Design a protein with these regions (language model features):
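Short gly/ser-rich loop at a beta-strand->alpha-helix junction or flexible surface loop bordering the NTP-binding
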Residues: 1-219, 337-359
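Surface segments flanking catalytic/ligand-binding clefts of nucleic-acid enzymes
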Residues: 10, 16, 20-31, 39-42, ...
Length: 359
């Protein structure tokens, strides 16, 4: 037998082999390495059975929930994408699940007010980043108790910070923005603030008052940066996040929503970003921009051709580029170096005066 031939190496070798076999579990039972590929995230909210069918174990789900990659609607009912682009159908489904979970938790905690991301969803503001447990706020002095599936915050809740939205008692938009900035960081705070300013949900005065009220609370630095960075000219979360990338990289501040015309006065387009001193246009292309018939795509190509004939360089990017924005920044820097400077005869464009001033 083959086994008999292996025994010739001596009893000690056989003993080591048996010991090694006992210590090493069979391949099917080995713990997966951290670098092992994880099952695909669900394309829509599903229950735990559906997640199991995709290859998710209970342990993997616990880790994903803790990391904010998926969100639970409570009682193991709903799971969904947490990292989808703001405004996308997947993201909206997850946001609705988060709001429903907050509502369910609020029923079990009568003094609680829906706050943070769930309050943003209730008032229509976009969210970015991981969506994990729903957040509720209770008045200062309330004894906190463990509430399964929810994150309770104890804080001052004056009447001016409370509104009703979709039938729920939630924190006001200005208070919600400051809470999000303090809890989830500047990126999430600025995206919500830009939208709220653009849509008239808040004024700069509202944001300033909300900041002053929480100026001594944890996270106040993020809240202050959010207040100073917010710009109601942004028309999408992608524009908000792109603007923050420009600032972090030290790029000159662009002119947002510039109305560009040809030198003869023909209207061309309103650009997302214009660096007029360099002759560069930046276009942040969001989700579902092109219709099935392709007509929008044709118009985009025609507009780009007009901009280029006027002497402008067009740089475009999308949501996927946010994962690593360095290549976009490099393309912009290259365009700045090649662009048409003021006074050049190649400069064949002008800027129309804005008809709408954003707060």
């Amino acid at each position: 037998m083959d086994g008999g031939a292996r025994v010739d190496g001596g009893a000690s070798q056989t003993s080591r082999c048996r010991h090694s076999a006992r210590m090493r579990p069979p391949p099917s039972h080995r713990r997966p390495s951290r670098s092992a590929a994880r099952p695909a995230l669900p394309e829509r909210p599903i229950d735990h059975e559906g997640a199991a069918a995709l290859g998710w174990t209970r342990a993997a789900l616990r880790h994903a929930l803790a990391a904010g990659d998926v969100v639970s609607g409570g009682r193991g009912v709903v799971l969904g994408l947490a990292g989808a682009a703001p405004g996308s159908p997947n993201r909206r489904q997850v946001e609705r699940a988060l709001l429903d979970a907050a509502r369910a938790s609020a029923i079990r905690c009568p003094r609680a007010v829906i706050s943070h991301f769930p309050a943003a969803v209730a008032t229509g503001m976009p969210t970015v980043g991981a969506l994990s447990r729903p957040c509720l706020s209770v008045p200062a002095g309330t004894a906190l108790r463990h509430l399964v599936g929810a994150h309770l915050h104890r804080a001052t809740l004056p009447e001016r910070d409370l509104v009703h939205a979709q039938g729920d008692l939630v924190t006001s938009p200005a208070r919600t923005i400051m809470d999000i900035a303090r809890e989830h960081g500047v990126r999430a705070g600025v995206v919500a603030a830009d939208y709220a300013l653009h849509e008239g949900l808040v004024s700069r005065g509202d944001l300033a008052d909300a900041y002053e009220a929480c100026a001594r609370w944890p996270g106040r630095r993020s809240a202050r940066i959010t207040l100073l960075s917010a710009d109601g000219a942004a028309e999408s979360p992608l524009e908000s996040l792109s603007r923050m990338q420009f600032a972090a990289a030290g790029l000159p501040a662009p002119l947002p929503q510039a109305e560009i015309c040809s030198i003869s006065g023909e209207y061309i387009t309103r650009s997302d970003f214009l660096w007029d001193e360099f002759g560069v246009v930046g276009e942040a292309d969001g989700n579902a921009k092109y219709g099935p018939d392709g007509r929008v795509a044709v118009r985009e190509r025609e507009t780009r051709a007009k901009l280029e004939r006027a002497g402008l360089i067009v740089v475009q990017w999308g949501w996927r580029d946010l994962r690593d924005f360095r290549p976009v920044l490099d393309r912009l820097q290259l365009a700045f170096a090649r662009g048409v400077r003021p006074g050049s005869k190649s400069r064949q464009w002008g800027i129309l005066l804005p008809t709408r001033l954003h707060p």
